[in-house]
Amino acid sequence: MAIAIIGAGLGGLALARVLHVHGIDAVVYEREPSRGARGQGGMLDIHSGQRALREAGLLDRFHAVARGAGQDMRLLEPDGTLLLQEDTPDDAPLDRPEVDRADLRDLLLDSLPDGVVRWGRAFVSADDGLLHFADGGSATYDLLVGADGANSRVRTLLTDARPAHTGQNVIEVSISDIDRTHPDLAAMVGRGNYWVLGNGVSLAAQRNGDGRVRIGLSFYNTAEDWFAASGIPFDDPAAARARLIGLLPGWDPRFTALIAACDDAIVPRAITALPVGLTWPSTPGVTLLGDAAHLMPPVGQGANMALLDGALLGLALAAHPDDFAAAVHDYEDEMFARTGAAARMSADMQESLASPDAARNMLAFFRPD
């Protein structure tokens, strides 16, 4: 029986890999023309998702590319007050290692036989066991798995739910080769995560394996059209940097120096999420995983849940190789409970980050005693 996976993200690839380990064939259809067609974003904090990599037989290879130093953390308030600094010993266990998303995706891609991923196949629709692609091609399937992200087309076969704006808008910037170009800022950020949490505004800087620091400047309790009203001239990087600094009155100059030093690519991103606890009636022949099933605020759960979705669906299919309906039912029962709890936690964390006491709330989270 034919298993079609739409989307070569982490969840879809984890599913394909676990199926391969169990001797089950699947095809992954990806709209991008090649694996390197688009940047894959920054670092991921992989914790619960390590179970998926173990089931995929890739945990040792994952540890080889993960960064234990990425577990370092610094938490500050906008006036410069340091609330928390945790530096990871070199021999510390890799409980929550950081890994470049691109490296993790490459690890999964390289673990699959040639031809499993079909590049340049943009899914359009499905009916009566037939997939239709934007290039006019088609393919048959017995089970269709939507691993096609936040704006999933496969999701429309199961539910009318759509992502909604969460009140958070993010400006993403980065500083390339920071150790050479800005060694003072590199030392300040450290080896892992650097958070400055204010009243409705946060700055999250993250060291990447390629020598850059990625920075997300979040504005909470803001409308979906906030970018248009913000006065940030995205087509003029120098003016955009100046405007962003102007949106941080009273912040320690060390923090605004990160914005002043950033590269010219200044990218706005509105944060959306699916309803917490979204479910749908189990439908033979189709299911979802990852952001397609449970898009949630970006606080460290999404990639882990996607990896687990892929691995656990793969295990369910291996347990019921001749009964896809039973496999999907078992998978969805577990997935709804697990990801519903993760989505609620993520929404609560986002609410905490949006509060006037965000920094102290985060300190209490990491140091509850």
Positions of the model-derived regions?
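Short strand-connecting beta-turns/loops that link adjacent beta-strands
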Residues: 78-80, 128, 208-211, 322
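C-terminal domain-closing interface element
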Residues: 349-369
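FAD/FMN-dependent oxidoreductases across multiple families
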Residues: 187, 191, 198-201, 207-213, ...
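Conserved mid-domain beta->alpha element of the FAD-binding
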Residues: 5-33, 145-146, 171, 242-244, ...
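A short acidic, helix-capping loop that chelates divalent metal ions and anchors anionic groups
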Residues: 35-39, 93-94, 224-227, 298
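Conserved N-terminal helical subregion
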Residues: 2-3, 18-22, 45-178, 224-226, ...
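Short, surface-exposed charged micro-motifs
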Residues: 43, 204
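Short helix-loop capping/hinge motifs at secondary-structure junctions, enriched
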Residues: 60, 177-185, 224, 254, ...
